């Protein structure tokens, strides 16, 4: 709307007034999403990621844990994510000259890697992924051990819930800055983590005071989380986008259950001479005060006085319950990064094409997390700590961190078509055999050794020709029989 200045300019220079009006309209319509007319004001607008975490991180964490513990489809979604993302393990294979020695040592150490003696190293990584998904983050503490402890490598890993980190610790100490329990030097390099001596929620003493936190060197801690915003020092639960919607769905289900309970109760409205319907003396008070005439016995015959009108109350059914629940579960699955079928186990509306499209999209997201987050920030750190400890213990001559990682193999959606496509890529030079093996979770070197061993055995047994004929769908020729001679 033109103001006084616009009118004044338009009076003496209409062209200039028109240009001002057009410019104002363009500015007003540039971003409708920034309009202030609807009163939408995001919470803590302009706050940093660390400020948001300091305010809401703990609440999101406890709510996410509650959903994981109590809501079946949330549990199914988280477990499906971990099963597909980690599976039976993300396996390293050394590329050093003494790779066989390193790999054998790692396999032996992995069985004893857990400081709590619960998991092997792959199980510990899976537990870390589960905790990082629900809580948003977790800690893995590197625990050096003595040679006398008898471990293959004197190192163990202790998986800690993020509650061990003193999130309330912020400020400055000795020229360093502490942000949500993480201490940085003046150059912004991570120096230490402020950890409690025990889990703050552990009930070990009824009279314990507030636990004190102490700094632990950063090179002894692996902080596993997936930052979303630049400068984000702490992780946020991956359930955060769906917490409110899951809660709304739970309330809706409770309301529907209550409505169904009311529908199953047969209600009757009586009109006319209702006083004669209640003959029992114990119900006289109820009749006078509330008009309650008692209950209807199942299968019984009730005598109704003349002049009494009875009307059965029939609550109207509310349609759309199933449709809304399915719609909400689709949104929840999308927010969790899994498919609807993984979340619910409902396969009734799935066909081959839709299942393939959903799985491909899910796998892209899982692979991105594997290669851009889990492997560089968790698996590599564990591998490097293992190599360092082995060198210090004299188990290896030198540090050589080079390795290949094998992620969990994906099951085929259509085995015949998928294998043909892979073979076409290999023959066309678009991929290598090793790459295809790694994408399926196999270790190329081990596969090649097994193939060589198999062919050597076939050759030594004289059955190689038969095997090759079977590969070309040709039946092997029967061995000639010796002629028989007649006996007199």
Residue ranges and their predicted role:
Residues 2-18, 346, 356, 373, ...:
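C-terminal anchoring/interaction modules
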Residues 59-90, 94, 124-133, 239-259, ...:
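Short, Φ-rich (hydrophobic/aromatic) sequence segments
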